[in-house]
Amino acid sequence: MTNLWYPKQSPLVGLTGLAGGASSYFVRSATTGAGGDYKIPYSLRFKRTSGSAGTSMLQQLNVAGDPKKFTLSFWYKGGNHQNAGTPAFGGTCIVSAAAGNAGSVHRDYIGFPETDIFTVSANPSGSSWQHNESTRKFRDYGAWYHFVVKVDTANSTANERTVVWVNGERIDMSANISQNTEFAIGKQNYYMNWGRYTGENKDYLMAYLADCQYYDGSALDVSTFGYWSAPHQWTARKPAIQKVNAGITWSNTCTASNGFNSGSPATKGFDGNLGGTDHVLGDYGAGNSRVTFTPPTPIPFSTIRVYGGRDSALKDKNACQINGVNVSDYWSNGDGWKNFTNLPGVTSPLTSISALAKTTGQVAYWMAIEIDGKILVDGATDSTTLSFGNKGSHLKFEDASALGTDSSSNSNNWTPNGVTTTDGWDNDQFRDTPTPYEEIEDDITTVRGNFCTLNNNDRTNAITSSGTASNGDTGIVASSGTWRFIRGNMTLDGGKWYWEYQVPGSTDGSNGWQMGLLSKEFRNTSDQDVNSDAQYYWGRQVTGRYNNNVGGSGAQNGHFDTSPATGAWVMFAYDADAGKMWTGANGVWDTCSGSPNPATGTDPHWTGMPSSGLIPSIGIYGSSLLGKMRNGGNGFAYTPPTGFKPLCNNYLAPTVGIGASHFEAVSYAGDGISGQKVNQYRFSPALVWTKRYNSGAAWWNVFDRNRGVSTDNCLFLNATNAASSRNTQLTSFNDDGWTLGTNGDSNHSDGNFISYAWYGGSSQVTDTVGDVNVSRWTDTTAGISVMYYTGNGNQSCWLGHGLGKVPAFVIVKANGGSYEWIIKHQFNSSDKIFYLGGSSGTDAESTPTGGNQGKIANLDGATTTKLKVEGEGGNLHNVNVNGQAYVMYAFAEIPGFSSFGQYYGRTDFSNAFPFIPCGFTPRFIIGKTRNVGPRDWYIHDSQRDPRDPIGYNERTKCMLPNKSDAEVTQQAIDMVSNGFKIRNTSGGSNGNTNYYVYAAWARNPFKHAIGE
């Protein structure tokens, strides 16, 4: 039996440093649920060449299907649908069918007809549309999404007629399709297309599609096509209907601690009936009767839902549990389906479900349990027959000479239009796929995964202007006399990399090109001229070299001895581990000095480069030029040097594979009852921040393992107050979280709370390398050190942090006395710091003066083992008063898990607001303007807004950690697989020309930007 985490890899590849250990995760085996080592070897690039031309796959079958019932499953990446619906771009249609190409015929549209909202639309009359639109906005151009669209319009339940899942999670849709509506899909002799709008021959797709499946006459659950291989990681499986019911009498293993309520026995929860009082319920008259279902054997699941409800007066948050995890917040009031898929702590397999009945008006119950789309019914046996029906098909795009081949038994082949399969940049068959597997015998053409493309979230100007990515985001169009830069969507963190650019035209007063690497800190704005300021840029223009401002403010003209001609392929080889890079053209490395050879590491053109945080990029200006990048997904023009790899995320090697093993955000509702456990964590926390976010009267609370749970254990982010004893607030640290007391600041019965927690290793140590002893909990894998020390009163004091790397973000606060919170960021100006709580919390960075003297010294002077605090004139209140106790939280940057950077505010183009590359999907972000005040700190997380849906954008719920305010609706952002995108003009996070610093921690690294 082979355990699968990622195809062709061991179960724990890329998942080192699991704080809870590998046993904390369920790994579905190859023999369970027909998952197996399913490979998707190719994708097809769909491109638009004009408003009415591009790539598509066409089919017209003179056979009747079922226009009321069908299922579509496909993987989708990239695309340029952010301004779909505008005259410049039109929509981007994924699949459609129509009676013909006239504008008023029976037709469908599935895709993005209006901006970035996914839509399932039908127009059976030819004149009246029925639209069912997502409430989410799909703005991640670097990740693979898995879509499943289930249509069953005969269903009597309105919201079951069109169901859409994305990456294994059912998403909310805005409306419902009328009962018995006939789609054009499934109609006899109608035209059907992948990649364009059939009804009017327009809206050609600009994206990659893979594994396109169409099941005629079947309404299938998402578990047919995928499963959760790790937290937040949806993985493709060999299509198979999952068998859950197998003649088992489920109610036999359903018990009630004090008996069942009259008329509500265990059988009521497993008879398949919904609604009314047909539910299983404990005897509330007996007091505290908990009904618990324990299956005879644990049930693996991809999706899990419960049809039931609870009374609004039931405040006990231990009342509803799955696998022992409290889920009462999600087991909402009133009858209906409750979705528990992928909640923190709720992982496959299912071992138990329980609901508590306390007294009259305080009960929880269920009517049905659904696993992978199958309701558990006593004695039932599921059919596992999977049929494509009459019109169904399966496009794998494997055969370059016959890309339209149907791999199902139907042989319903498709006709490719506008597709190129000849070798070269124009080849539309890509190895860019959602099932990564490693190269075989050092042959890079055998690797599969998510390849680096150009990032339409991260360009100099508006999407309707020049500088926009095209052709599957491997090209950039220029039609302006101003430089337009665009970065890729993959940060090169360690390793050896090779890629190519094609020279689009001659360089003169009207045209130009630049190629190379830009840092994630590069100021990607329309007024950024690298010829006068090349900071954070390593690249070339003709014979000029850009070297991060070294040797001049812009390019070093004449550095290279060859000038690549129009059409030449410029080569780059970057050894991140050695900090070296080489360039050349058409198979020959430039010989400006010595004998350059990337394979042996000799005579590089750049040295001393960063080992992480750099991104392949193109700069271009001119008249209708097309700059092209080759990432290796469809081959290279020239053979890479030995040991150098294409730009594929499968070669990334993040230290932390799952962010939730070291940092996590969890929301919970208070019940005012001592003993509630916040137990959705995969580790025992060393540092905890909590806040009631639906009230403006609640302070931020800070706990850590060094100070424990008794005396002076709670500090307040938003205030300078000394610590208070809050042993009725947090009563214990546990292996999977902590236990709450009755204090309303963390457990108010009407409160909604957010908690952020960091892992700090398995034990406390005493660090003696500095001037005073430091007690600390340190997670060196994830760059987290939770420290506690007593000041010695000296003007400078070294403190051991134990990170093994130089810290990039440090917070310190006196535990006693009304002293400031001090924050030092690696991008603070020299000798300057930030304040957090109190009246100074809105200040721009400053040099401490007067009573606020005392600071964290510049971090470029810190070492991998210790850092320094210092002051002047004997005034050290904030950092080192003799005999005063202090907490300090120090963080080092770990590529793929944490990022501590800066960005530049800009509001000139709404679609070109700042994009901040992180190399991961952020889980939590805290930021602040650096050079302008007064401005609040801001916090965004992917838990509150809304509660942890995958890929949800935009996020508008912001927290202000320097204030006690409730969450506010402002400072909108998007969180995507490789960073975050600002979506606002607020001075708090995007004042024009302001500089901002941020700290961000990951949910998952970009290596796993597939079904994430």
Model-predicted regions and their roles:
Residues 2-15, 20-42, 49-52, 156-158, ...:
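Extended recognition patches within non-cytosolic domains
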